[in-house]
Amino acid sequence: MMGRVNSQLLRVVQDRSVANGEKLQRLYKLISATGSKTATATTTATTTTTATATGGGRVLALDSHVHRWFNTHVRGSKFYSHYHFLIKHGVHLAHATRFFNKLLTGSEVEFQLATFQIFLINEENQQVFFEKFHRLYTFDMMLQIFDRLIARRDFRYVKFYLAALTRKMSELATDRTRTVQDAELMYIKFNNSLLYYLLMEGNVPMFLRTFKNEVEYIKSSTLQNSDSAEVQQALLKPVHLFVQMLRKNNSPDLIFELLPALQTKSRSKVFNAYLTSTVASTIRTFNDPTLMLKFLLTTAKGTKFPELLNELGLWRYIVHGEPGKIDPKSLQEDRDKFEKANSVSALKAMKRVDVVLLTELYRVFLSYSSSVMSPDKFRHCCIDLYSHYVQFCEQNKHKLRGWKFDTGVLNVILYHIRYRLRDDKLAYEVLVDFYGRESMVQSVKNTAKKCPFSMVIYDNGTVTTQQLHALLQLMQRYNVPLSFQICYTMVKRLLQMNEPEQAFEWYTRILESGFDVRHHGLVELVLQQGWSLPHHFNHDLLEDDKLDSIIEEEPTEECAELVEDVKELMQSV
């Protein structure tokens, strides 16, 4: 029957001899006649409008070309009446997304029509919702409506929407054309929306139970190796919602509710690593070194992590608030106390996570210490931790390649010396000392976008010209690539020394290296010297004052590096 109806509708659409207004009326007449043969009308009234809708009956699946014609020729002022007409006559709304999205963001009465709330307000007309909502909308459109209502904190009819979604899933489960992956994705999307509702409602216990169940389901599903962006987004959404829940409730200890789910055997190391790194990044926002230590010990691979932290001088600082190391007996006592207070067994994670999280521990501890210690005590703390770190690295330099030895910890220490302690000279001395240990440095990998040399050289007036050249020679010796910060500093320094030709050579390096010229200080110098900006430079930035300034920002590349690796892996599988 629908094949014949669609043929008639298409003939009307393609008839060039008929004006668009007349076409619209003919299309409506054909749809109305088709719908009236299989449906009965029910009338519902609101204070602003009258909505009439059919009850049961078949769904009319109009040809997509007919919907396209509607998209082009139905005026904005008629969107509401058009959409109401489609609902009234049982037209499937999958291809009416233009009207759907517009009404969702329109007036209150338009929103009520798109969400079918108009049929729920009056109990006498709720049957229309029960019979039509799940039949006229796709599953994803139903979820979109549900999420939009939750975002508005409109929980009045949650049970109706959840019942409709459950009914839709049950019907789709019997569709033999759908794959196992389709069913898994549908279930995960539904749970994501349910988590969002529990988050917004503030039901933490139910949120945690639902979250753990979903993570365990994901780990046993066949979707983890999918390269679909839609699938990846669905898989990672529960983690984002969990992070939102932690921050909303300001309850960092709840993060350990996640650990049992992390311990579940996963088909995908990528997904497991993403969970671990996301939790670590979240913990950092609470700026609590004890909390980070607790999490790091639960995610550590092997049993020697407390010993490592003791060798690095971190354990005594975090646990006892004092510098130095403690004896093995005291360390074991501390460890026993920790295990007794925290009954969480070790987690399995990617091998490199240990180093990434170690860098995070340094970052959190130094950030916290800079706010509670006096400047003199914090200075001693930075020097003490650096000394223990390089001593450990030199003693274990033959093992460092397997340990993924990089510049993460050094960057964190240098950052806090320069921008928290405000001691540029000490930062220079630490950098020179580190790269003066030749046998150790040969094992170092510069994995961060902002290398240690950039951290020290950028806008550092205490570094003399002679010292600057010595640092550049060190970079060349160890194949450390030039960064924008270093090139900009050289341009600025040489212009101050009245060496415009050499300064221009460094500016040329910036252009040849492909660095994006958006820095306010550099653009100002270029304009002052009459040099040419790159041909692709957006001159609107000058008028809108949208140029960048390289500010004092903590280097987060080491933790972000793992997340980027995860994304790349997920895209490549």
Curated annotation (Swiss-Prot):
Q: Which residues cross the membrane?
A: none
Q: Which GO terms describe its molecular function?
A: translation regulator activity
Q: How does it sit in the membrane?
A: Peripheral membrane protein
Task: Name the UniProt key words of this record, in alphabetical order.
Answer: Membrane, Mitochondrion, Mitochondrion inner membrane, Transit peptide, Translation regulation
A biological-process GO annotation:
positive regulation of mitochondrial translation
Q: Where in the cell is it found?
A: Mitochondrion inner membrane
Provide the primary localization: mitochondrion
One cellular-component annotation, GO: mitochondrion
UniProt signal peptide: none
* InterPro entries tied to this protein: Atp22 (IPR017207)
Task of the protein: Translation factor specific for subunit 6 of the mitochondrial ATPase. Required for assembly of the CF(0) component of the ATPase.
Stated family? Belongs to the ATP22 family.
Name under which the protein is recorded: Mitochondrial translation factor ATP22
The organism named in the record is Candida glabrata (strain ATCC 2001 / BCRC 20586 / JCM 3761 / NBRC 0622 / NRRL Y-65 / CBS 138) (Yeast)
Quick one: which gene encodes this?
A: ATP22
